[in-house]
Swiss-Prot record:
GO biological process per UniProt: microtubule-based process
Entries under Pfam families matching the protein: Tubulin_C (PF03953)
Cofactors, names only: Mg(2+)
GO cellular component term of the entry, any: microtubule
SUPFAM superfamilies membership: Tubulin C-terminal domain-like
SMART domains on file: Tubulin_C (SM00865)
The keyword GTP-binding appears for this protein: yes
Annotated source species: Lytechinus pictus (Painted sea urchin)
Acidic residues: compositionally biased ranges: 160-177
MF terms (GO), sorted A to Z: GTP binding; GTPase activity; structural constituent of cytoskeleton
Name by which UniProt lists this protein: Tubulin beta chain
Length: 177
């Protein structure tokens, strides 16, 4: 969400679409403890609220994509969507909300997995769950699912448009056989 400032200070600053866009993509403003500069965006949605030019919003979003093209996967066309609602949020002249699916989230999943593994190895707190009817195997399965998710995000981060073309050809060969 942008602007990330106190409501009281809002009346003294006039925000621009450019500043909102910059704040949205700023690593310090992310709600998850991962740095998007360590990954690539698969998809992005940005919702702007307030009186502003749709043209300016589109230009700013395109500008971010062009300046930071290495942080966006090229094999998903039109992977950035924007919307503008001309009714501003209460107490603000304009705001923006950002939702991004970035491969950088694997950092967070890896940390959680490491912490889980350390606790599970010691069987810490496990009795509370098994006492309620859960099986130890469910935890092992959840750990495996988490590791699969991390691997999948890593593949998406490393993938290129050329590789996807090769994959399509392989699929066609399998169907022909």
């Amino acid at each position: 969400f942008a602007p990330l400032t106190s409501r009281g200070s809002q009346q003294y600053r006039a925000l621009t679409v450019s500043e909102l866009t910059q704040q949205m993509f700023d690593a310090k403003n992310m709600m998850a403890a991962c740095d998007p500069r360590h990954g690539r965006y698969l998809t992005v949605a940005a919702i702007f609220r307030g009186r502003m030019s749709m043209k300016e919003v589109d230009e700013q979003m395109l500008n971010v994509q062009n300046k930071n093209s290495s942080y966006f996967v090229e094999w998903i066309p039109n992977n950035v969507k924007t919307a503008v609602c001309d009714i501003p949020p209460r107490g603000l002249k304009m705001s923006a909300t950002f939702i991004g699916n970035s491969t950088a989230i694997q950092e967070l999943f890896k940390r959680i997995s490491e912490q889980f593994t350390a606790m599970f190895r010691r069987k810490a707190f496990l009795h509370w769950y098994t006492g309620e009817g859960m099986d130890e195997m469910e935890f092992t399965e959840a750990e495996s699912n988490m590791n699969d998710l991390v691997s999948e995000y890593q593949q998406y981060q490393d993938a290129t448009a050329e590789e996807e073309g090769e994959f399509d050809e392989e699929e066609g060969d399998e169907e022909a056989a």
